[in-house]
């Protein structure tokens, strides 16, 4: 989006790789510290996730005595290089002010590694069923892949920068949204299929934004493009369809009173449901493609004008609830199972930025500027609000649905945590290697939509 906030960062180069390799060689065979008992993953399972051998980066020699031949050198490097694939333990934290991504173990609290892809990590995603990391930046016309087991990296050149990345479950495919095009990349053979149709605007004044938002249904491999200038959705399938396959236009103008174009949104894994905002922030919309049916939140913003006043909508893991909110504190929630098509309205006394759910979808979470709220789906009065001074930069819920992780824009870089079951705060985990902890990603999550 043209008003999308980008992670601001400076360039930097990772140093001390040889020293790291030497230290790893001395520690060969030593695993992570045992996880503490309780609800965390078992130490045995975590060790299996995080200790798989892999090939060393090209051109890096192991420290210690010289090997006798290439095969011996290769085996020595395999023993030295450690996998950083542990989807239930490792959190990848992007720095707001540099190129660095810190890898932190949320079980032991240890710093695992700092990664540098020589680009600002505005876009960072991990596969949920594979050991693959993808990183992009609005300033680089390329995407970087890293196999977290083997540590192999591959940069794939693209026609324009990447703004959105979606891993396709049970495949080696990634859907991407570029500056004005969308397409798919295979990280098995790194082939690129970019669809020829462009989604741009006559109003473009800079190259570091888009004038559309891509929603992607991961199971059906559906591309849903929201037009920022017009109240239209453009739809097509990826997969084996020809590059020049036609796009279907879905006109929502009769459903939007303000006549605004479309803003941001999220799609269910199949072609059942889209949740989106209008670009002017006046309302949120639910679109059901099979019935060509639209539900509206009604007016959201009350007075004034703000920059992207509505935040990203949220569809829970079971597609039962859809939640909309704006930065002024207005919240609208649809119950698609027991509701009557009308949203339940709420008002909070802080400025929301993120919506999430947890503890097996019994609780929804609203986090933002100076506050975080936990509320039961069944009982709206069962609510807890925690107030603080900083703003929440990003939020993630662990795959077991029990822990909310978030970062703040003040203080030392850290991963802050809440136990969603008790709604009590857990001790923060210090994040090394970054100036300000911002975006959070893990290889596991409690919602397929995210």
Regions found by a protein language model. Name each.
Residues 10, 26-450:
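Predominantly soluble domains enriched in secretory-pathway, periplasmic, or organellar proteins
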Residues 5-25:
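N-terminal export signals
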């Amino acid at each position: 989006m043209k008003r999308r906030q980008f992670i601001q960062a400076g360039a930097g180069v990772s140093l001390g790789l040889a020293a790291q390799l030497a230290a790893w060689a001395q520690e060969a065979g030593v695993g992570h510290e045992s996880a503490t008992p309780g609800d965390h993953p078992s130490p045995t399972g975590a060790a299996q996730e995080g200790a798989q051998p892999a090939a060393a980066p090209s051109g890096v020699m192991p420290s210690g005595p010289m090997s006798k031949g290439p095969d011996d050198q290769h085996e020595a490097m395999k023993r030295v290089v450690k996998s950083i694939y542990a989807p239930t333990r490792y959190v990848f934290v992007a720095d707001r002010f540099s190129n660095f991504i810190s890898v932190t173990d949320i079980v032991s609290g240890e710093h695992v590694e700092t990664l540098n892809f020589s680009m600002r990590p505005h876009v960072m995603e991990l596969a949920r069923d594979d050991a693959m990391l993808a990183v992009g930046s609005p300033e680089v016309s390329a995407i970087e892949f890293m196999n977290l087991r083997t540590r192999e990296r591959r940069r794939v050149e693209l026609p324009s920068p990447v703004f959105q990345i979606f891993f396709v479950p049970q495949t080696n495919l990634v859907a991407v949204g570029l500056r004005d095009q969308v397409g798919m990349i295979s990280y098995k053979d790194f082939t690129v299929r970019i669809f020829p149709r462009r989604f741009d605007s006559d109003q473009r004044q800079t190259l570091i934004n888009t004038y559309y938002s891509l929603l992607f249904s991961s199971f059906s491999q559906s591309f849903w493009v929201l037009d920022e200038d017009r109240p239209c959705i453009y739809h097509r399938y990826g997969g084996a369809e020809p590059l020049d396959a036609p796009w279907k236009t879905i006109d929502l103008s009769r459903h939007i009173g303000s006549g605004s174009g479309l803003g941001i949104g999220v799609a269910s894994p199949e072609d059942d449901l889209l949740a989106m905002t209008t670009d002017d922030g006046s309302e949120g919309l639910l679109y059901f493609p099979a019935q060509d049916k639209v539900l509206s939140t009604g007016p959201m913003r009350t007075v004034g004008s703000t920059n992207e006043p509505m935040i990203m909508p949220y569809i829970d893991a079971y597609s039962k609830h859809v939640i909309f909110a704006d930065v002024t504190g207005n919240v609208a929630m649809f119950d698609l199972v027991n509701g009557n098509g009308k949203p339940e309205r709420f008002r909070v006394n802080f400025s929301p930025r993120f919506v999430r759910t947890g503890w097996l979808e019994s609780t929804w979470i609203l986090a933002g500027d100076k506050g975080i709220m936990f509320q039961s789906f069944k009982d709206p009065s069962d609510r807890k609000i925690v107030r603080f001074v900083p703003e929440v930069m990003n939020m993630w819920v662990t795959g077991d649905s029990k822990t909310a992780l978030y970062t703040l824009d003040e203080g030392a870089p850290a991963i802050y945590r809440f136990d969603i079951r008790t709604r009590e705060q857990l001790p923060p985990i210090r994040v090394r290697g970054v100036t300000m902890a911002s975006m959070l990603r893990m290889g596991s999550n409690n919602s397929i939509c995210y």
